[in-house]
Amino acid sequence: MKRTLFVIIAIVTAGACLAASPEQSKQFISPVYTIDKIYHSMEGPSSVERVYLGDPAAPAEVLWVTGIRTEMVDADGATPQLPELMCHVNVDLDPARHQALFGFRRATAARLMTLSQGMLTAKVPAGFGFPLASNEPLLLFTQVLNLNIQKPQNLKVRHRVTIDYIRARDLTSPIKPLFNVGASGMVQLDDNPLAMAHSMASMPVPAMASVTTDAGHDSTSMSSAASCLIGARAPQATSTSADYVDPQGRKMTGHWIVPPGKQVNHSDISWFMNLQFDTKLHYAAVHLHPFARSLEMRDMTSGKTVFLAKAENPPNAIGLLHVDEFTSAEGVPLLHAHKYSLISTYDNPTTTNADSMASVFLGLDDPELVVPNSDQLAHASATLFDANTLVLHTNIGTITAAFDREHAADTVIQVSRFVLAGAFDATRLIGQKNASIAVTPPMVRTSSLLQPTRLESGVERKPGTVSYCRPGGARMEATILIDMDQPKDPDSTCIGFARIVKGLDLLAAIQPGTSASIVNAETVLRPDAAPKVVAAK
């Protein structure tokens, strides 16, 4: 069932990030949830909605996300409800879109910010923020729980979520960019009686509601919104109950049992964080379950505590009254050569087993980001996500191809990223012996632009199909192939992403051993350039 998320915009005149920079807030009201019984963590009614901080139809501009908060309200959207009914709120990026828009070399984590029971507000230090394009889709996941009310009698409740941000155009001095990194405490799954086979695969159906982004990505690429875990489940563990597979090949889970009494769990998160450079920690949010006492992030190399978050439990009920967050304008150094661990402490006072998790969501200094201005961001957004045509300007004439974003969304973004960076400029169309024409941009131009792409069906390989071939195996460099005949043995590393609509006769003149020069390439939006494209079988 499609749900509607109501949006309210509020302007806060006194900026929290910079005194002279007014902070804006956008409010989202979740669907009405009915609480009719006891719901433990991740079991209650939930929804996933796509939201925007700006107008998705307008040219993109740079925003800085500075905070998030949620309030539990009645069905009317205004009357306060019990905070203890809050399970969690996740705000997730579309990682491929975000990475391409801002030109990141590193992989981008999906989870931007999160809230959970005991932590209903999160705010980065003044002068810091997470960069976001105004037309980027966010996935807003909200969920409720009920740990204490035995007869709730169909209690109606909603989340009222507020996201705070600053428009870059309103800044009077630069803001310091943060990037998001997450990590989870884990236990080994195999032969471990305390491990819980409780992952996304076993979540209630409502929490996995199908969502499709404007970039064409479906819920499989952004399904982390419906989980407190970090990132996607390990692909090696798709058919198992594992959430992750560590570098030693061990199946790990981020959910485990806390038996009666005290339990301390140590987890190496170095491989999880995968820091590529030295940085500083300025912000951390923590996700814990009832009976948690604390969560510590420790530098195992130096033996020093990075931060310690304490949790407060209610005296006569189950839940979390308060969980510390961490903020620091000065920052705590995190070194890529050091090892880091999460140490969770639980104390279960009951006579039965309890479930547990321990996750952190970090905001780190971003030394790599070159902040685009609004014109640059709008151009990048149009090139990467709006254009439907690839245009090659050559010495023999103009060649155009129609993109197929339906069957090759990630591949089109990858190729468009090359175009945006000028990787195809002053290259050559070279005739091949296998009745195809190849374009191979220099590796020095493409190596920093490569991003992981999921396996896509792509366009059927036949004369006129344009394919992207990933580097690997015998092919050392990223290559564009144009089929001039039916390929006899199609390369499985090549994904068709477009069809030639103009210039096929020009290409036919390029025989094996001959070539033509590409002056430059561009992507454009043409209303008449969308022929019917057949997906690969």
At which residue positions do the language-model features occur?
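Bacterial N-terminal signal peptides
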Residues: 7-16
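Cyclophilin-like peptidyl-prolyl cis-trans isomerases
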Residues: 371-537
